[in-house]
Amino acid sequence: MSPKSTPANASDGSLLTDSQAIERIFQHIDERTTDVGTTVWREPVEHYFDQARFDAECALIRRLPSAFCPSSALPEAGSYIARSAAGRPLLVVRGVDGKVRAFLNACRHRGMQVAAGSGCARAFSCPYHAWTYGGDGRLRGVADVVKFGEDCRGDRDLIAFPCHEEGGLIFAVLDPASECDIRGFLGEMMSDIAEKHFEDWYYVGQRVIHGANWKVALDGYLEGYHFQAAHPETIAPRTYTNVMAFEAYGPHMLVGYPAKTIEKLKDIPK
């Protein structure tokens, strides 16, 4: 660690303010330093591909709130998105009451997925035996129910997951027995997220990249050391290389890389 480097910070319970982050970044730019750890950490290679570790991580993720999509992705009643999250097929729907609900995307008869992709629908019908569910997850119809028997009624609604909408984002917990307590999980970070007004953003779409190791991909977003070498024509001309502000907040972290336009803030009174 450089003598002038600032160690990574552990929050005392309060979020780093914008002015505090800016002051720290300006100091790093002037002194050619960055936030770093207090010790050297070597990540074991097996952490990137060990299946048992991956399964344990997915189990943990399923018990915690995760941002599934922006609110603008479900603009009207019947809007839905169906995709996998942490290894589970999820169906998120905005109901006629405006409330967003999350379900396991699996028919309660034989487990076929009842929806794919995204769109707008009043009901979801299983492509195997045509069991039909409403946007509230309730079983609405069973083909040839007289011959099938009334046993299919009552407890055959789609399995619901805890779901919460706030700050223009839709959160879900992939464990029916858990709670989606966003404020308890994110604390002050939720207020910071709400200030971004994501509800006013326009949803364009999503792209799924198959085959990538998600940890390797994520690593690239946790450091700015590679900007000059890997992005000499795009990011590097506009962003300071290897200058970072880091703040730990409970199990969460805030990471920021300054664009060179940050210099304009020097002329603005604090």
Regions found by a protein language model. Name each.
Residues 2-106, 110-116, 162-165:
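N-terminal pre-ligand scaffold of iron-sulfur
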Residues 3-11, 94, 99, 105, ...:
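C-terminal catalytic domain of Rieske-type non-heme iron oxygenases
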Residues 50-54, 156, 182, 214:
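A structural signal for well-ordered alpha-helical scaffolds and beta->alpha junctions
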Residues 52-58, 150, 159-161, 189-195:
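Intrinsically disordered, low-complexity boundary segments flanking structured domains
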